[in-house]
């Protein structure tokens, strides 16, 4: 079975889950997943995991993201995207000076409420399922980090604002559109969204599903943030059997265990000071 990860350029109109179908078919395995869901209306880089690499989903999901987003002022939909039902309208369209001033409030550590149509869990149910059934519920605000917002363009006549946003995991761009508009006494939704970066990986390095090849599969060697630890031959069987021995590691740090012959043996993750768990054993 193949093991590795892929940088897929997800197309608009497909869910992240649907994007996995051709990957499963190509590699002839159901052991395929993705890290960091992209909404159906969105496009851009989606990290997909094959084989044992599916166990690294948590790592890839935790990486920072970059998006290019388009907000349309004057309308709000229930989903805060183009596919939703219009729930609010206004004739007031903010000017660019006010937008630039308010954007500063959305940089740094901020608290935001995820959209009602999202995969957030509410008492054991997904928020979007409750919303579809017309249920009343509240979503608690969450702390996220927005590292930078750059205005790319603003067309007052069409009410379209284009932004580049760098942010931490868990940041909802749809919530930024909603909250920015509210702060300007207007309303808005995200009319277009493209993810351009996940961690160190860029959209330009991704591939469309129809262009898949075995060469598209990326190994752990490309993860420069994973330190390599070389294991002596007398300890290789210990690694293969998941036996613990002394390795210096910090909490949440990932390390690759390799033989002196450069063969990857395992991936470990720190769960405390010099304490770790095996994530993958090859």
From Swiss-Prot:
InterPro entries: PsdUridine_synth_cat_dom_sf (IPR020103), PsdUridine_synth_N (IPR002501), tRNA_psdUridine_synth_TruB (IPR014780). It comes from Borreliella burgdorferi (strain ATCC 35210 / DSM 4680 / CIP 102532 / B31). One of its GO terms (biological process) is mRNA pseudouridine synthesis. The gene is truB. The keyword S-adenosyl-L-methionine does not apply. Responsible for synthesis of pseudouridine from uracil-55 in the psi GC loop of transfer RNAs. Keywords: Isomerase, tRNA processing. This is tRNA pseudouridine synthase B. The active site is at residue 39. Its EC number is 5.4.99.25. GO terms for molecular function: RNA binding; tRNA pseudouridine(55) synthase activity. The keyword Isomerase applies. It catalyses: uridine(55) in tRNA = pseudouridine(55) in tRNA. Gene3D superfamilies: Pseudouridine synthase (3.30.2350.10). Belongs to the pseudouridine synthase TruB family. Type 1 subfamily.
């Amino acid at each position: 079975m193949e093991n590795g990860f892929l940088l897929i350029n997800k197309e608009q109109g497909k869910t992240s889950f649907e994007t996995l179908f051709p990957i499963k078919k190509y590699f002839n395995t159901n052991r395929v997943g993705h890290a960091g869901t992209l909404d159906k209306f969105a496009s851009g880089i989606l990290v997909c995991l094959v084989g044992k690499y599916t166990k690294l989903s948590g790592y890839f999901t935790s990486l920072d993201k970059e998006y290019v987003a388009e907000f349309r002022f004057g309308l709000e939909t229930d989903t805060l995207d183009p596919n939703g039902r219009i729930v609010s309208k206004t004739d007031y369209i903010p000017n660019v000076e006010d937008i630039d001033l308010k954007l500063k409030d959305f940089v740094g550590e901020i608290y935001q409420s995820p959209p009602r149509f999202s995969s957030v869990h509410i008492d054991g149910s997904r928020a979007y399922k409750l919303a579809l059934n017309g249920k009343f519920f509240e979503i608690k605000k969450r702390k996220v980090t927005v590292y930078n917002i750059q205005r790319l363009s603003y067309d007052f006549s069409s009410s379209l604002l284009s932004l580049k946003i760098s942010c931490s995991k868990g940041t909802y761009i749809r919530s930024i559109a909603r909250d920015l508009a509210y702060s300007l006494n207007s309303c808005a939704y995200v009319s277009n969204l493209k993810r351009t970066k996940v961690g160190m990986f860029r959209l330009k390095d991704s591939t469309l599903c129809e262009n898949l090849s075995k060469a598209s599969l990326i190994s752990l060697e490309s993860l420069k943030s994973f330190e390599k630890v070389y294991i002596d031959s007398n300890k290789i069987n210990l690694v293969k059997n998941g036996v613990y021995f002394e390795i210096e590691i910090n909490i949440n740090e990932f390390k690759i265990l390799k033989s002196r012959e450069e063969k990857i043996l395992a991936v470990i993750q720190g769960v405390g000071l010099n304490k770790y768990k095996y994530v993958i054993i090859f």
